[in-house]
Amino acid sequence: MRKAFTRIRLRNNRYAAYIIGFSFLAVSIILGISCGSLHIPIPAVFRVFWHQGFGGSIGSDDPMYTNIMMNIRLPRVVLAALVGAALSIAGAAFQGLLKNPLADPYTLGVSSGASVGAVVTLFLGLHLPVIGGFTLPVLSVAAALATMAAVLFFSRLVHASMSVSTLILTGVITNSFLGAFISLIIALTGDNLLPIVHWLLGSVSMRGWSYVILFLPFFLLGTILLIINGRELNVMTYGEDKAKLLGVSVQQRKMMILIAGSLLTGSAVAVSGTIGFVGLVIPHITRLLWGTDHRHLLPLSALLGAGFLVLADLLSRTIIEPIELPIGIITSLAGAPVFALILIRQHRGGRSL
């Protein structure tokens, strides 16, 4: 009874939910900046931030700390936070739209399209003169957008209203086909396999501010589009017919949500590789803590996902120093048992996911 009462209080206190979410993200960012092969004391972290923002004197060690923080750790932490937020909010939106608790950002196959773009770039050693070092993420984003267009076109071709089942099956077909294409390239790669495998397992290392700047427009556009559709997502979870009766332009809103979620997913995969379980588990945890209202579920999922991926990246580079593990390994090792516990908890409580 007490647990149920506590859960109801958490769900009804939205201010507390956002305070917890922002606090979790802030603590994760500070830890992500402070911890590493060279430990930066937390007071020094705040001094450097203060100096960057307002000027003033700094300690004798702070110039070194400033260089490490601003050029290495902070862009890495910011990119991890943005990718985690993007995957989580896209996962929450797809689970609501498709009415499928097992849906995640990769359901529609857009991530496979982004992966094909990256793998082909690595396999052929492409380096376009106009975009230089941005060749891989730019071509990956382009492949993701092309895949999204193909999935939506095929879904509409099969079923004019793009039913949920049609979208899911189209995603399965796309994932299978593009996954086979990736496997073919891997089989043909030979001894130069490591860069492709490392990219596919996900990482935010050695990215820098340029990757943050490249990803940020897609993140802002996709996130804003999803959040402004929170009320419509609430209505559409009860069925498209009821949503139409309540005045929701179902096809227009569905297309907007699909495009926004696909933009977030494709661009996230383009800059970080494939990172599993974030977009599947984080929305379930958020829903369990603070309810199913998408007006709050979406931004709260983004906050928790951002903090989670920052901590996962921290573990990936510190748990077996000096070896740095791909971040996708950490998220899968952490996400799989957590999702299993959520599943057991829900079924013991007599509720479905």
UniProtKB/Swiss-Prot annotation:
Pfam families: FecCD. InterPro entries: ABC_BtuC-like, ABC_transptr_permease_BtuC. It comes from the Bacteria. It is a multi-pass membrane protein. One of its GO terms (molecular function) is transmembrane transporter activity. The chain crosses the membrane at residues 16-36, 77-97, 106-128, 140-160, 167-187, 208-228, 263-283, 296-316, 323-343. GO terms for cellular component: plasma membrane. One of its GO terms (biological process) is siderophore-dependent iron import into cell. It is found in: Cell membrane. Keywords: Cell membrane, Membrane, Transmembrane, Transmembrane helix, Transport. Its main location: membrane. Disulfide bonds: none annotated. Belongs to the binding-protein-dependent transport system permease family. FecCD subfamily. Probably part of an ABC transporter complex. Probably responsible for the translocation of the substrate across the membrane. The complex is composed of two ATP-binding proteins (YvrA), two transmembrane proteins (YvrB) and a solute-binding protein (YvrC). This is Uncharacterized ABC transporter permease protein YvrB. It comes from Bacillus subtilis (strain 168). The gene is yvrB.
